[in-house]
Amino acid sequence: VGLLAILAMVVVPLPPFVLDVLFTFNIALSIVVVMAVFYVARPLEFGVFPTVLLLATLLRLALNVASTRVVLMHGHQGTGAAGHVIESFGEFVIGGNYVVGVVVFVILTIVNFGVVTKGAGRISEVSARCTLDAMPGKPMAGGADLHAGRVTQDEARKRRAEVRAEAEFFGSMDGASKFVRGDATAGILILLINMIGGLAIGTLMHDMSLADAARNYALLTIGDGLVAQLPALLLSTAVALIVTRMSGEQDMGGEVARQLFGRPKALWIAAGL
């Protein structure tokens, strides 16, 4: 049902208030995913993360298409034509200076695409490869423990299932990270389409001056881009966190506090410096 709704968003024009609700839901979903990643002790505890990541990426792309349609069709009516969320993001970031808004959006895109997404994709690829390479040895070690009587048959079966689930998880993460990187690329192209197309439509079809068209469409375009890039950056961060997460007994906060602040000598030296 959710997938069909996402596909319908691409085809059916959405009113601005529906876009506001969906953009708010998208941001909230990204925050929930990041928080869930923080509180898992092992990556397999969030085994549905690749599926959630894929659905969230598809939702964001569908919202990009829907908002682009609204911006290009109704942008000449004013900065509130695409909803309050896009207008608020645009006004907050631009602050009366459109160059600043464009620069902020470009910086966020570079951070997301060139740093977080690229690094997370590389880590996912290496993790999947290392997990697959280690698969033959782990069942053999479990079989040796079973024959030696160190584990029961149920425990050996559970270990084999965990090895298989771990390989499937990191393999899925390797593929899902490609969707995230493609989404970041699509965000750049959508920004250019909205800006160039908006200026052309405003000046040629609605007899707006170049300054008025730039004011309306620049604000809507930058607001639309930021509303999409913020959840994308959060999900990219979640991908990077979960693929770099080592299995432990505590969540990420507990492990960081124990390992980073568990050595008083290092803290005293840092305080002295």
Regions inferred by a protein language model and the residue ranges of each:
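Hydrophobic membrane-spanning alpha-helices of multi-pass integral membrane proteins
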Residues: G2, I6, R258-L273
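Hydrophobic alpha-helical transmembrane segments
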Residues: L3, A8-I27, F38, G47-T57, E91-K118, K178-F179, L273, ...
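Central hydrophobic cores of alpha-helical transmembrane segments in multi-pass inner-membrane proteins
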Residues: L4-I6, F25-Y39
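Juxtamembrane helix-loop transition segments at the membrane interface in multi-pass membrane proteins
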Residues: L19, V34-L55, V65-G90, G114-S177, ...
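Residue-level signature of catalytic and energy-coupling elements of molecular machines
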Residues: L22, R60, I123, A176, ...
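Select transmembrane alpha-helical segments in multipass membrane proteins
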Residues: V99-F105, T152-D154, A270
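Transmembrane alpha-helical segments and their cytosolic interface motifs
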Residues: E166-I196, V227, R263-G272
